[in-house]
Amino acid sequence: MNWNNFKKQFENELTDNILNYWVKEVYDTNRRTFFGRITNEGKKFPEAALSAVFTTRILWTFSAAYRFYPTAIYKKMADEAFRILVETFWDNENGGIYWSVFPDGKPEDTKKQFYAEAFFMYAMSEYWLAFKDEKAKQLAVSMFMLMEKYAFDPEFGGYIEAKTDDWKDTDDQRLSPKDLDVKKSMNTHLHILEAYTNLYRVYKVEDVEKKVEHLIRIFLDKILDEKIGHLILFFDKDWTVRSEIDSYGHDIEATWLMHEAAEVLGKKEIIEEVEKAAIKMSDVTINEGLAPHGGMYYEKAEGHTQEQFDWWPQAEAVVGFFNTWQITKDQKYLDYSQKSWKFIQDYIIDKKNGEWFWGVGADLKPLRGDKVGPWKGPYHNGRMCMEMIRRINMIEK
């Protein structure tokens, strides 16, 4: 295996294609903000609102990228995302961040969705790791306190989905229109785990440590259906199961995010338990979630597999399978990681206009989804490149 050549592919993809596109096309120097929507064809919508998920993911990505390549332009992108989040998203009266904000800084949707609040913590922790900015650390810790106060469920464990802007119960808790309106979800827990893990890197206190362990246990004991090797997506407050959908992208993403959390926590028995789960979930994903050409299906609902290959499950497959190879040293997982990367190179990367398509359909032609939007930032593909560079660096040492 020529590790150096393999690594260079990810380095070039990250700097020349993904980050370069965001610097040149998504940041608007005149308005000092980001375009909240850009189509596949490159049409820009200056009036489009910025979502919290989108803006925090820009902050995380460019902060993380700066740690690999400390360049002034990456710092500027991170600084601008930081400024926008602090000046316009942060609720000065109640704390926490709004769901979406218009380009002029006025809130569009003021709800507090804990998925987005977690991404704020994840990004602020990364900004501190990159620039040692004390305000970022302060904000990340404040968000931890708010989430423990308003999202944590002391009765049944885990975290609820959403509150109003002033932390009251809300009658619509859904993350997006396609989600169920329930109290708890796998997706929100996955990104709270990811955020708390990053916070623990910068704020090593017992309170955070206990919560990282609690979240890993929630995944192993409640969210993972051990019998079938899939994560359950939706629950009532008391963990009554509310869905029978298999999400292959989330399954493979969770294998490595759970493992990362366990390793940051550093408890041997938890690491071993997570590794066992990661191997089983990887095997199930290979057997059920991959098409013959190497693309990962979006999901299976009511026995029907959706023949759609969105960008983000492909990115998570590269890292997830590589991580399982690192755990097992079984060549098949490395092969599947490389196969996923080849599928991305062949079908997902937009070689003409830059960045990645939303995905491809069964005919392997690009889907109509926007290239940049509330749910499409530089995070899944940018993080994949950085994770692969980091992991290959460790092997080369």
What are these regions (language model features)?
Residues 1-397:
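Glycan-recognition and catalytic cores of secretory/periplasmic carbohydrate-active enzymes
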